[in-house]
Every structure is written in structure tokens, then in C-alpha cells.
Amino acid sequence: KRQINSSTMLTDVLKRDGLTYQNAFQIGTLSYSGRKGGRALGTKEFEVTATSTVQDFIDFIEAASGIQSLQLDSQNPILASENRIPGETGDLVPGGYIQNGALRFVSNTGELSALEIDLAAFRIEDALGNVTTPNLGFGTSQEAVGQSAASDFIVYDSLGVPINVRVTATLEKRTDEETIYRWYADSPENQPLAGTDVAVGTGLLQFDGNGNFVTATNDRIAIDRHGVPSVSPLQFTLDFGLVSGLATQDASLAATRQDGSEPGVLNSFVVGEDGTIRGVFSNGVTRDLGQLQLARFANPVGLEARGLNLFAKGINTGLPVQGAPGESGIGSVIGGALELSNTDIGKDL
């Protein structure tokens, strides 16, 4: 049998099963549900056709696993891993490639970036709806090392749709003067115009000799939302200001606050003393809905009554001084209070 190469058709790839060989792929929809750092990556799909190549499959797994290549951060290149596989030399570059006729996928550095691709990670459905499990189990050639910490949290797009995000930070360098971590961000809901990439951001975190956060080379995440009517990309900033680089037994990372929210409806509103009308929504969010404006006159006695508790500027009232409650000697507002009646009972009777 010939060894596979990048241009080999997927339907021609054979995998040994005991004393026989069987096709590793068949035409249909291939579903991939791998794991990284012990956490599920989410399910991505790849259409296997008669013209699909091994390189197409490699690109799919690399993108669906969130493996970030050296070129993604040109200013601060992503590091390769030290190669400790017996009989091999050179670094292990993150990504997918063919090694001695076998497929190999190298994750990014850090224990929580380690890929797990077993038999249960794949399902393929043919045109008739028959579902099978292809013989595509991957073993581990080198265990992942490197102190890591990860945090899973939810953000919301412009329609209030919840989006899962995972940020993993891995120790990259430590000197007498500083500690450097690299963070990687993944989102299974990332929907690029083409492809299945779940990687949505990366950058470096610098800490000084006292463990204090100094700076980040990048603090923004961008999640593509093609195929849905949400604003695309969904962009937000990570605040690393409360993260420290102190030495601990187990590194940890957590998202403590975010300013997005799920959809909500207006439940009630309140009026503040400054005239601000603030809405209270079912999702716990409060937002300013409007602003009351008041006016005062030099001669309020000259106001002309228009009925229904309404008055208009008169000839000798002077010009109105308008503003928010409490400004420029203007009266105040008491929320929830009832106005005293100014009805002339004697006249009305």
C-alpha cells in the first residue's frame, strides 16, 4: 500500500483493521466532536465528496479544534513545542500534517490545550441517512505539558443570542523580571463566511516580578456571526486588570463580570429625582428610557390655563428657562408621588 499524501482522495484512504484494510472515509456528512483540555469542543461538520482530499480533512480538523498556527500573531509568534518523540528531531509546530504516512495533529502548548480525538469523536451520515462510526481513532504520541488555566463564560450577540466562549491561558516564559502567559480563545458558535474555525483570538499577558499585571498585546475577541441576522463580528474586550501572575499550586482563571445580557421585556419603570426615566427589564438589566424636562417662568401667575391641568406661556410670563429637574432653580421631581389637586372646587361647583 502507498503512503497517503496531502492530495490523496479521502475515499482512497485505508486503515488497517487486524489482518485486513478498510476504508477510513465514505461519501457523506462527517461530524466531529473532539475535546480539548478535557472539555468538549462542540460539533462541526465536513462534507466528504468524491473530490475531498486528505489536506481538506486536515484543514477541517485543525480549524474545528481551534489549533492556532504560528502565523496568527505575527508580532508575537505562537511558540512550537519541544519534540520529545523518540527518533524525531526539531520542534512540534501547532497544526495538522502528515508524518511518515500518518495523520498528526499538534495542539498549542499547555495541558489545557491538549487534543483528545478518539473513535467517539466521529460520525458519518450517508445520503440515505445511515450513520456509522468511521475507524478514525487517534492515539497520543507526546503528552501535553505546561501550566494552564481556563475559563468558560457566555457572551451575547446583538440579538441576545448566548455565545459560549472559552479562554485558556498557558505559561509561555518566566525570567527574573517577568512572567509571560499566552491566552487562546475558542467559541463553537463562531460562524465564519467559510470554514469551521472555532479560534477567535489570542495574545500575550505580561506580569512583573511582583505578579502584577503589566500589559496585554491583544485583549479583543471577534466572533463571526455569518448565517444569522446578528451584527457580525461580535467584538468585545477582555479586561485582564484583576489577573495576577503569582505562583500558586493550581493556576485558575475566571470571568467575574460581563456587560451583555439575554433578551428581556420591560417589566416596570421608575423616575429619578433628576427626571431620568429608567426601565427595569425581565433579564435584570436597567436602562435609561428618557429624560423629563421642566421649565420655570419669571412670572408663573401669567401662565394661561388650557384645561386638563395644562398651561401655556402668557404675554407677561417672561421667557421659559428649561432644563432637567433641579437645574437653574427649576423645581424637582418626586417619583411615584401623586400631585396635589389644583382644582377650584368652589368654581367648579
Task: Locate the predicted segments by residue.
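S/T-rich, low-complexity, solvent-exposed segments of bacterial secretion/appendage proteins
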Residues: K1-L349
